[in-house]
Amino acid sequence: MAYRNQQEFIKALEKEGELVRIKTYVDPKLEIAEITDRISKSGNGGKALLFENTGYDFPVLMNAYGSERRMCMALGVKHLNDVAKEIEGLFKLLSSPKENIIDKLKLLPQLGRFASWMPKVKKSIGECQEVIMMKPDITRLPVITCWPKDGGPFVTLPIIHTKDPNTNNRNVGMYRMQVFSERLTGMHWHKHKVSAKHFNEYKKLNKIMPVAVALGGDPVYAYAATAPLPENVDEYMLAGFLRKKKVELVKCISQPDIEVPSDADFIIEGYVDPNDELIWEGPFGDHTGYYSLPDWYPRFHITAITHKKNAVYPATIVGIPPQEDAWLGKATERIFLAPIKMTMVPEIVDMEMPVEGVFHNLVITQIKKEYAGQGQKVMNAMWGAGQMMFNKILVLTASPNPSEGGALESFKITEYEKLAKHVFKNMNPATDIYFSQGPMDVLDHSCSKLGFGGKMCIDGTAKFEEEIDEMYDVRSEMYDVSEILLTGKFSEIKSVNVSLLQKQIPVIIISVEKSKKGHITELHKTICEMKEAEGIKMILYVEHTVDANDLGNALWRFCNNLDPKRDNMLYKAQSSNNRALTTSHIQHQTSNINYFACMGLDGTRKTKELDNFQRDWPNIIVADEKTIKAIDEKWDQLGLGKFIPSPSLKFKEQMYGESAVSLQKI
């Protein structure tokens, strides 16, 4: 379904009871974000919010994509899987053998459909150009400031248009924009992004780079801008496919080489000069739940701003999960499962990106396994597949027994307890965990080097005979070790989560206050030498400010803070007398000695003093007390129902100081 514009989408949301209008004055600086954070975490994503009284000429739309239902409405489908099924059908149709002329002629209607999705450039002006600011001034837009330590207000749902100067190929992406003055913002494109490649090409040619930013319009545009498409595939073709109608584009007024959606609410036109000095941009409370720290990025000079007469300013916030962006990620997970399966990993059955993994940190993949080593084959293929190159932790699962002909176990990978039992039943910590390194998201603060760090694959697939180490001692008996670990002997341990252990999943989570170099390595060895720990296959360590028994938040912190290649500690010992084997013995063992193994993973905060970590470590994102109090006091006026306390309250004591950079000592 194609929406004529954002206003039609707003009406549809309101008709379905998915939107609340807020008529009380709410400040775009921090207050809109605090209200949205409460609503988005209130269960099932809450409602979309239309702030009609912001002190500006334009209302602000928030949380429009923040639930499965609203995400489906934005894409015009009943279920997110519907898109994947349609894409898979197209792939099969195009790739199937055509035996005669009749079969080939049957393709013609489908090729006609392809043509109907291609974007079209209109010669007339668009709705987005109904009003032209004679003196462009982005500060007249209600650009929100999301978090107290942000560097300023940021445009958070910008649909950014650039072109390759050599091929004229368009790219549409989404990169935050910090507002510095009336006609100047930052342009936060990372080095891996296509727009950054375009920037570098303009730099080689010593040419000014035209750029245009759209806000609003059909809600599918913002999704298409986030989609992980191949470099030379036009995002507006994807948008046309999703809305079943081609996107109509118009030429910009001051940057006529760039075309933008006719139905957008706002267009911000301008340029980036490759010869400009870069600007110090940030901090910004990012989708990882941590601040991304300041760095140098290009300047975007605004040359024109146009908008519709009844324009609505769309925005989003990101931060500690879950947030609205989780549903944009879920749509990508579902939509791009079919292309991955049809082009790169044919054995893939399903894929899941848990919200605690904030997209790249944790991906679970279910495969149909048919031969030994297939898990490693999938691992390498996945890490080479577009934006999957940023993945940190990959968990593989498959059928429970290869001899059963590859039949899948009767659980979905979203059933996490059953999944974990399956994975850890089939996983030998000494042989089935693989480490690598490569490109990482620039926002990953755990890497010792910016954008380059460790990766880990946990192969939880059922093993063929060739993959099994017969010397591994599989222990079925597991002990509740929490009482032992929470004694005076382990004063550095603040909490222990044995909830998984109690469900026969051999994993525990331990919260530790580090006080010396090598503390986690030493502690892991000490714990593993206890007889009661012999059945445990993995121990996850988090920092002392984290409640290990708050499973979701502990996993979120753990995944963010781990560099798997740097932060792993494999303990391996003889089963008979618990004598620890050396690392060399682990890697080159030839004797027939039964052993057990436990993998330790250090997901604590890293510092210069204790870990020789040389980069700044960011703080988690928490609202300030003044903003929390202001929203508490005006809650009854907002029309949002029962009072919802600030989600930030549970995290206030987990901060290290008050700045975006965490204090080294606290």
Where are these regions (language model features)?
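Extended, highly charged
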Residues: 1-666
